[in-house]
Amino acid sequence: MNDCIGKRLDKLINESQDEVLKRVVGQILEQNGKARISQDWVRRCGDDFNLTAVELALRCLPVAACYASAPVSHFNVGAVAVGQSGAFYFGANQEFSGDAVQQTVHAEQSAVSHAWLAGEVALTDMVVNYTPCGHCRQFMNELNSADRLQIHLPHSRNNRLHSYLPDAFGPKDLNISRVLFDPQPHSFGFTHADPLVQAAADAAEQAYAPYSRALSGVALQVGTQSITGRYAENAAFNPSFLPLQCALNYRRLSGLSDVPVSRIVMAESQGGLSHRSITEQLAHSYLGLEIEYFAL
């Protein structure tokens, strides 16, 4: 686990008088920094402290914010996505100094992407320590649960997403019925002997790109492990989430941000656009690596 994240978590335990917070941090440390909590643990902790799932998620926000990386804004945002399964998926904002602001990962994007890669089928609630910005409201409007997603803040609970985004423009306006978190039945018939290349291609098959059809996936060699990310497109285009950010986010929230990345593989289908250039830019500026690119 990243030393900075570990120090922040230790500080929470040492300085907080909140026994719930201490229990959550203890569980995260026991998991070697993996920033997600199973539905069984959520239920047991809620029962022990007589808290609803949303009340518990609100108490988790300082823990989620420990995963933020904000060298530009110095403004740490934490989020907790509550899955239909009942599991919690933490998220936090991540900025990349020296690169374009468009490369930034927003906390809500982080939590949503975390849940998506972990195999969650839908989200019921988004809990965040600051009001979602317009970018994130539009991003969450792409979810298969957007019509019923509840937003909870420390000062305001039980608000539907669409109360923050009235008269919203989204996938339905473009006749898209299979949306983010729905199964994406793509198949390229691509096979490769290199497991990391195959992992990138497999990630691209699960990407969501109904507008451009430019499906893309990234695979990172992180020590002995591989971490993948996939593209999540948005009807408004600019809030789309890129595959390298998706993979880096999952690496950080899996407690592996201190393990060096030695290879980056990108696999992409031909569509109305390409993310090769912007991915190469971040790979070079943030990781000092060149990507290995494969056209599908």
UniProtKB/Swiss-Prot annotation:
The active site is at residue 108. Keywords: Hydrolase, Metal-binding, Zinc. One of its GO terms (biological process) is cytidine deamination. The keyword Metal-binding applies. It catalyses: cytidine + H2O + H(+) = uridine + NH4(+); 2'-deoxycytidine + H2O + H(+) = 2'-deoxyuridine + NH4(+). Zn(2+) binds at residues 106, 133, 136. GO terms for molecular function: cytidine deaminase activity; identical protein binding; zinc ion binding. It is an enzyme of class 3 (hydrolase). Its EC number is 3.5.4.5. HAMAP family: Cyt_deam (MF_01558). Belongs to the cytidine and deoxycytidylate deaminase family. This enzyme scavenges exogenous and endogenous cytidine and 2'-deoxycytidine for UMP synthesis. This is Cytidine deaminase. It comes from Actinobacillus succinogenes (strain ATCC 55618 / DSM 22257 / CCUG 43843 / 130Z).
